[in-house]
């Protein structure tokens, strides 16, 4: 019995190559998908942490965008306190991500222990393809993480553990991401309409609320941006990218490089110029 358990745990330590032809969930960015061996491994646990609590909405939006790309039913599990502080998933916001609200089942629990148990049970259900658990407790036991990884591997369901802040604790997760809000723009008006308030950018990047801009603007034009760091990857290299979510294509794209002011040309001092004149 103990040896069998050890073999199962050793299997989790291998690169996140999914058996039974499940493959990976591509993000749509060639460099990232290559680093992930084709995409985010299905049948595995992945951790997504916000840079800080101020960026939790951005991390949430990143998770929702991944869920939108799967085009399947999903379960969202959150603690009562998290729902009270951050709000529940918001229908129009989900629609903007290409995630039909009827595909989502939301479950609220009282404690982080209940959340992890519910998440594990949901992973046993083959009727869903993604299970997202939003945990506020910074410390999650290694045993609980292993159980989640084993449950995901058995069912082939994609498991996302959403955290309010980064952690260095040992994990069986196939990948670990740290996500923050990047400056969002309105296409064609990058110079004048760039938003630099992280709280506003985070709300734009989340499907939890109405888009942060006024109704006088065409909110569908606003493309949320994410500063995504892949800090742990069992399948290959790590890296960091500024990603933009395209609602119309339901995929991530690399954000265009921000333009910078051209350096001033050398010119003669005003007094010298006057003398020459």
What are these model-derived regions, one by one?
Residues 1-76, 93-102, 258, 266-277:
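Detector for small/aliphatic-rich hydrophobic stretches
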Residues 28, 59, 86, 115, ...:
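Helical mechanochemical/support elements of P-loop NTPase systems and associated helical scaffolds
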Residues 73-129:
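Conserved inter-motif catalytic segment of the P-loop NTP-binding fold
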Residues 95-97, 173-183, 228-229:
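Acidic, Ser/Thr-rich peripheral helices and adjacent loops at domain boundaries
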Residues 108-180:
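P-loop NTPase motor core
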Residues 189, 193-221:
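A cross-taxon signal for low-complexity, glycine/charged-rich
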Residues 222-235:
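A conserved mid-domain beta-alpha-beta active-site/ligand-binding segment of alpha/beta enzyme cores
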Residues 233-277:
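C-terminal regions of RecA-like/P-loop NTPase motor modules
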